[in-house]
Curated annotation (Swiss-Prot):
Pathway as given in its UniProt record: Isoprenoid biosynthesis; dimethylallyl diphosphate biosynthesis; dimethylallyl diphosphate from isopentenyl diphosphate: step 1/1
Protein name: Isopentenyl-diphosphate Delta-isomerase
Function: Catalyzes the 1,3-allylic rearrangement of the homoallylic substrate isopentenyl (IPP) to its highly electrophilic allylic isomer, dimethylallyl diphosphate (DMAPP).
InterPro entries to which the protein is assigned, alphabetical: Idi_bact (IPR056375), IsopentenylPP_isomerase_typ1 (IPR011876), NUDIX_hydrolase-like_dom_sf (IPR015797), NUDIX_hydrolase_dom (IPR000086)
Primary location group: cytoplasm
GO molecular function: isopentenyl-diphosphate delta-isomerase activity; metal ion binding
GO CC terms, sorted: cytoplasm
Organism phylogeny: Bacteria, Pseudomonadati, Pseudomonadota, Alphaproteobacteria, Hyphomicrobiales
Keyword Transport: no
Annotated keywords: Cytoplasm, Isomerase, Isoprene biosynthesis, Magnesium, Manganese, Metal-binding, Plasmid
HAMAP family recorded: Idi
């Protein structure tokens, strides 16, 4: 895809195994069989009825197309705090506003490969958020379908493998379920447990050496 002349490519923050930032790279270039470790986030959005927004990834996504997953995922840009990245991405992808953003799994990371070899490899802190409206108008290039469901039904269905979801969502559900049946009461984790790359403002000029 050719970007407009005034639009910069979306970047991701590359990391080492210690969670430190080592550089940046265009998002469009990093997903392959040897995807480098990079910083991301996952967010689980709940409405006023405490229902979870579950989304189906668009069919032309590079990674796990057409698969059910959590509400939203994304990558912070260099110098962008995670909460601001979540607000931005939720609005871009779902056309809703994420409020009351809370860190719940600060140390989550995963590596998973599709049958074609394309791999995800992320330091991916997990957040919960609230949305005051149930009306969603997603970007169809990102999300092909969506539904609000009860959290207990969702995690029980995922754990029983009655509902097949993305590999990161599957692993996250196993860690979120013990936090309690009421997502609004999940304990908030300390930000100091985040990867260092997520706690440090990264110079936007940082390049891969």
């Amino acid at each position: 895809m050719t970007l407009p002349a005034n639009q910069s490519p979306e970047m991701v923050i590359l990391c080492n195994e210690l969670g430190e930032a080592t550089g940046t790279a265009p998002k469009s270039e990093i997903h392959h069989s040897d995807t480098p470790l990079h910083l991301a986030f996952s967010v689980y959005i709940f409405n006023g009825d405490n229902k979870l927004l579950v989304t189906r990834r668009a069919s032309d996504k590079i990674t796990w197309p057409g698969v059910l997953s959590n509400s939203c995922c994304g990558h912070p840009q260099p110098g962008e705090p995670l909460t601001e990245a979540i607000e931005r991405r939720v609005h871009e992808e779902l056309r809703i506003r994420a409020d009351d953003i809370r860190l719940v799994l600060p140390e989550f990371s995963y590596r998973a490969s599709m049958t074609n070899g394309i791999t995800e490899n992320e330091l991916c802190p997990v957040f919960a958020a609230h949305c005051k409206t149930s009306g969603v108008n997603p970007d169809l290039n990102e999300v092909s379908a969506w539904e609000w469901v009860h959290w207990q039904w969702f995690f029980e269905s995922v754990q029983a493998e009655r509902l097949l979801v993305s590999p990161w969502c599957r692993a996250q559900v196993d860690l979120l379920a013990p936090l309690g049946a009421n997502p609004s009461q999940w304990p908030v984790a300390e930000e100091r447990r985040l990867p260092k790359a997520a706690r440090t403002k990264i110079d936007v000029q940082l390049k891969v050496s």
